[in-house]
Amino acid sequence: MRRLALACLPILLWACQPKKAAEQTNGRSVVDSARTKAESVNDFQIVPGLRVGPVRYSTSEAELLRLLGPEVVTVGDSIYGAEGDVLIGTTLYKDTADQLQILYQDSAQRQHPELVLIRPYVVDADGTPLPDVKPTRWSTADGVRIGMPLRELEQRNGKPFRLWGFGWDYGGSVSNWQGGRFDMGTQTMLSVMLAPPSTLSPAQTRALDSVSGDGEFMSSNQAMQLLGPVVQTMQVTLKP
């Protein structure tokens, strides 16, 4: 943060501090109040194909701004995709554990959300995990959520599934639910990407090496089970 070099008496500088603190406190109060109001119209429920909280296919960026307010909605935001793509969309709850990004079918007018990305802000620009991050509140009715361990995801699917090896743009993405509970055939409305734990034991490091690369692996693979990846991001497709 840029600091101003002020030449003033210590007593004058001290006298200015309570006002500044009060302004900061009031600013936080306004933001907190606005977000509390927004949460009254957002249940953080994911229904693949239908909605993600208040976001539906019929929604526009302008409508979200009216509904949730500028404290929650970042309009015309840069959204980074695979292979270096940069797209323009909308971000909700930017730089928080509830961060959500929206890409539209009509990208010019930002209408008709097509893809909704649940991407919690949990690491800094260098990839270092942020301390004391609260769990994201987004969840499906089946309980699928960010941070869910591989084994629990298997249990909720009802059987093992396939996922891509780690270490590349699509690494950790579920490629086939293998006829389980989350299998919707060719119409995939919920895509899930898993990632290895932030800290690894020597055995887990060896396991990661064996399940990396652009090949597919079963979740029941012994090395995959030892590695114990968790759900890192989710992508929801909304139907017209």
Positions of the model-derived regions?
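Sec-dependent bacterial lipoprotein signal peptides
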Residues: 1-14
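Short helix/turn-capping signatures at newly exposed starts of structured segments
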Residues: 17-166, 170, 174-240
